[in-house]
Every structure is written in structure tokens, then in C-alpha cells.
């Protein structure tokens, strides 16, 4: 009788353990699915925000470029115009990064590619930050 009791209790313990392991696996898979869904949502929101910022920045740059086109330009204005055009091209290349990277990296070795992207980052960020600063400064002057 004691042996049957021990076997029955052992069987119950083993089945309870198997069920808890199965539940743990299910909860882990459900958690993974939820994490993936939330990451997709975050990426979607980030892409929408980035798209909106790019659109607004392109519009501001086009407006700024049109003001330089309509008036007489000095050498400094011409240089600013060239930088704005470069920024516009870089922003357009963000829409199609594979094609832009393919065009720019043909025939370069890895070190030249790394230097190219570093220069490109500087070329994008410098004028963009300067332009945004100038626009905000102009707005503050007009408001004040």
C-alpha cells in the first residue's frame, strides 16, 4: 500500500511539474509575441515621426532656397545655396538608402567608405543645424 501511495504521489508531482513547465513555455512565447508587437509599433511611430520631420525640413529648406534664388546672391549666399542643395540631396537619399549607398560606394574600398559616411554625416548635420538655428533666430527676432 505504501508503495502504491508513493508511486501515485510521484506521478501527481511529475504531472504538475510538466504542466507548470508547459505553462511557463506558453507564457514566454506570449511575452515574446507581445514584445515583438510593441517593437513593431514603436518602429512604426518612429518612422512616422522621422517622415514628418523630413517632410517639414525639406519644406523649410525649399522655402529657404527659393528666397535665395529670387534675389541677387553674393558669394556667401551662393555657398549657402550649394550647401542647401547638398542637404536636400542627402535628405532625398534617406528615402531610398539602398540606391544612394549603392551609387556612392561603387569602386571604393572599406576605409574610403567609412570616411565617406563620416564626411556625409558632417555635411548633413552641420548645415542642417546651422539652418535650423538661423531660422529659429530669425523667428525670435521677428517675435521680439
UniProtKB/Swiss-Prot annotation:
Q: What is its main location?
A: secreted
User: What is known about the tissue distribution of this protein?
Assistant: Expressed by the skin glands.
User: Sites of the modification Asparagine amide?
Assistant: 70
Q: What are the UniProt keywords, alphabetically?
A: Amidation, Amphibian defense peptide, Antibiotic, Antimicrobial, Cleavage on pair of basic residues, Cytolysis, Fungicide, Hemolysis, Secreted, Signal
One GO biological process term: defense response to fungus
Q: Which residues form the propeptide?
A: 19-43, 74-123
An annotated GO cellular component: extracellular region
Compartments where found = Secreted
Which interval of the chain is the signal sequence? Answer: 1-18
Q: Which Pfam families match?
A: Bombinin (PF05298)
Similarity comment: family membership: Belongs to the bombinin family.
What name goes with this protein?
A: Maximins 7/H13
Origin species, per record, is: Bombina maxima
Amino acid at each position: 500500500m505504501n508503495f502504491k501511495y508513493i508511486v501515485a504521489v510521484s506521478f501527481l508531482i511529475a504531472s504538475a511539474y510538466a504542466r507548470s513547465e508547459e505553462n511557463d513555455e506558453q507564457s514566454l512565447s506570449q511575452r515574446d509575441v507581445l514584445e515583438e508587437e510593441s517593437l513593431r509599433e514603436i518602429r512604426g511611430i518612429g518612422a512616422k515621426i522621422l517622415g514628418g520631420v523630413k517632410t517639414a525640413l525639406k519644406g523649410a529648406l525649399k522655402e529657404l532656397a527659393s528666397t535665395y534664388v529670387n534675389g541677387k546672391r553674393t558669394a556667401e549666399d551662393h555657398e549657402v545655396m550649394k550647401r542647401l542643395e547638398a542637404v536636400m540631396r542627402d535628405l532625398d537619399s534617406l528615402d531610398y538608402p539602398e540606391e544612394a549607398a549603392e551609387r556612392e560606394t561603387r569602386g571604393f574600398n572599406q576605409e574610403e567608405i567609412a570616411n565617406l559616411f563620416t564626411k556625409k554625416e558632417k555635411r548633413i548635420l552641420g548645415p542642417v543645424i546651422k539652418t535650423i538655428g538661423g531660422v529659429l533666430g530669425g523667428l525670435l527676432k521677428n517675435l521680439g
